[in-house]
Regions:
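Cell-envelope/ECM-targeting effectors and their regulatory/trafficking segments
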Residues: 24-30, 148-151, 163-165, 178-185, ...
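Short amphipathic alpha-helical segments at helix boundaries and their inter-helical linkers
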Residues: 39-40, 75-92, 144-158, 234, ...
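Acidic/His-rich structured neighborhood in mature extracellular/periplasmic domains
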Residues: 93-242, 252-253
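Surface-exposed patches in mature extracellular/periplasmic domains of secreted proteins
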Residues: 63-72, 132-138, 190-195, 221-225, ...
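An acidic, Gly/Ser/Thr/Pro-rich helix-cap/linker signature
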Residues: 31-129
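Bacterial N-terminal signal peptides
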Residues: 11-22
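Bacterial N-terminal signal peptides that target proteins for export
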Residues: 2-13
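Extracytoplasmic/secreted envelope proteins and their assembly/folding machinery
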Residues: 48-55, 65-72, 119-123, 133-137, ...
Length: 494
């Protein structure tokens, strides 16, 4: 889903939409504004007041009151949407779990089957927009499982709820205006309008404003159908990336090998020429020479720190991030694309699963301690963003540690020690009750570990599944159903 795209648009939309809706018509001799639609109560007076006010302002800006009435009548705020929007997971899954869960055999198999089914269309789309079919399929698979994911909301309900909730009101009011325009122009019928909980539309999960500017009628049937028409979906994704600067024929990333005593502080997001990286001893992990690539620009990314894979990210990696502002997302798309072409879907260097990762509470503590020591980690929000990464890197450099900016329990204990805080001793895992065991069995089965029926009984199959999971995740192998194993399994399943 393109929820991170919203953040990049939020400031612009907040200013533009507020100004546009508030100002009203300005043309000389404009016809009198028609009355806004009327609505029966939703049972929520605050929502009713917002809806009436929004409809009035939208009509003043030229939206059709009849269409607005049809879209917004019967809409009530959806508490589930608000819950999903506000959730803050306690445990953010490590990058290796995120990647491995999404670059799955099922997604690869289904993507290859789709490529075989509509190969001619994908080839034509690639020729027009310059975006490889594997990249298009990678995004398609992530966004909607190639159209198999259920779209359980109407966008008018999702967007109205999020606009009413108020945290990003102008942004979501802008999406509602775009949705009304879609219907007014006959680009999509109200009956086919289905979305995610965040109001993202169809198989490519476009927000309504993106639909207006980017969706493609590939087969020229007069309809930009991103819900059921595979040609329109593929072309729309290709058009999106092309519009945002995709460079035909250039790579997305190169996995590389770093020399001994490499300065990890260079993994700071700075774009440098491949020739510059080569001069610093960086080589392709495949052993292939850099010939012909020296002038390309790339930044170094260490997704799991100094002990994990090292990647040079090229311009097109950043273009994929325009679809979803996440390095992890872009990496998964690129790995799926390789799999669509019959190449290996895994990186060469294995993930260092033994180092673990921090949960939200630990990240809050890390940020607090770093700020208190004079390393500016920014807001203490439990989110490991660029500010916290810079602070970690500065701390590591000051302590003569590899300045990879990657947070681990070992790093947190090092920060605690330097801050004069008692180092936390490892907590003895707590055993699960019957309901916890059932949940663990369900999650392990979903992850592909054969734990047997979810009956709450810890038999041989369940113990063996726990041991296999612990080995795969770098945990101490005990074969016990504990809160630590359940927490790790939940994170792996996200």
């Amino acid at each position: 889903m393109m929820k991170r795209y919203w953040m990049a648009r939020a400031v612009f939309l907040a200013a533009a939409v507020s100004l546009a809706i508030a100002c009203g018509p300005t043309s000389v001799g404009a016809q009198q504004t028609p009355p806004p639609p009327s609505f029966q109560t939703s049972g929520n007076p605050e929502f009713d007041a917002w809806r009436d006010d929004f409809a009035r302002r939208a009509v003043a800006r030229g939206r059709d009151p009849v269409v607005l009435g049809r879209l917004l009548r019967g809409v009530t705020p959806d508490e589930r949407v608000i819950e999903l929007d506000q959730r803050q997971p306690e445990f953010v899954s490590p990058v290796w779990d995120y990647v491995n869960n999404r670059v799955s055999e099922r997604r690869i198999t289904d993507g290859r089957a789709l490529k075989s089914s509509i190969g001619d269309t994908l080839t034509a789309v690639e020729q027009r927009y310059g975006v490889p079919s594997g990249i298009i399929l990678g995004i398609w698979g992530l966004e909607s499982n190639y159209g198999e994911a259920a779209l359980n909301w109407t966008p008018q309900t999702a967007l109205s709820t999020l606009a009413y909730e108020g945290r990003r009101r102008a942004q979501f009011e802008g999406y509602l205006l775009a949705l009304a325009e879609m219907v007014e122009r006959g680009l999509a019928s109200e009956g086919e309008l289905r979305s995610s909980w965040a109001g993202a539309l169809g198989q490519p999960q476009f927000m309504p404003d993106v639909y207006l500017t980017t969706a493609v009628d590939w087969d020229n049937d007069g309809h930009r159908d991103i819900w059921t028409n595979r040609g329109d979906v593929a072309a729309s994704i290709g058009n999106y990336l092309n519009d945002r600067g995709w460079r035909r024929g250039e790579p997305v990333f190169d996995e590389v090998r770093l020399p001994n005593n490499f300065d990890y502080a260079l993994a700071d997001g700075t774009m440098r020429s491949v020739a510059d990286w080569a001069a610093r001893g960086v080589t392709r992990i495949s052993g292939e020479p850099w010939a012909g690539s020296e002038n390309l620009q790339a930044q170094l990314w260490l997704p799991a720190g100094a002990q994990g894979p090292a990647l040079l990210l090229h311009h097109n990696f950043g273009v994929i991030r325009r679809y979803n502002n996440s390095d992890r997302y872009a990496l998964v798309v690129a790995l799926l694309a390789r799999a669509m072409d019959g190449r290996a879907s895994a990186l060469v260097r294995p993930w260092p699963t033994q180092i673990g990762s921090l949960n939200r509470e630990q990240t809050l503590e890390l940020q607090t301690l770093l700020n208190g020591m004079g390393y500016d980690a920014g807001a203490v929000d439990g989110l490991f963003g660029s500010g916290t990464r810079r602070a970690v890197r500065a701390f590591q450099a000051a302590q003569n540690l590899p300045a990879d900016g990657f947070p681990t329990a070992t790093l947190l204990n090092e920060v605690r020690a330097r801050a004069g805080v008692a180092v936390e001793a490892p907590r003895e895992p707590r055993g699960l009750g019957r309901s916890g065991v059932r949940e663990l069995q369900r999650v392990l089965n979903r992850l592909g570990y054969s734990a047997g029926p979810a009956d709450g009984e810890i038999g041989t199959r369940t113990r063996n599944a726990i041991r296999a999971f612990e080995r795969a995740r770098g945990l101490e192998v005990r074969g016990r159903a504990t809160d630590v194993v359940l927490e790790a399994a939940r994170a792996a399943a996200r």
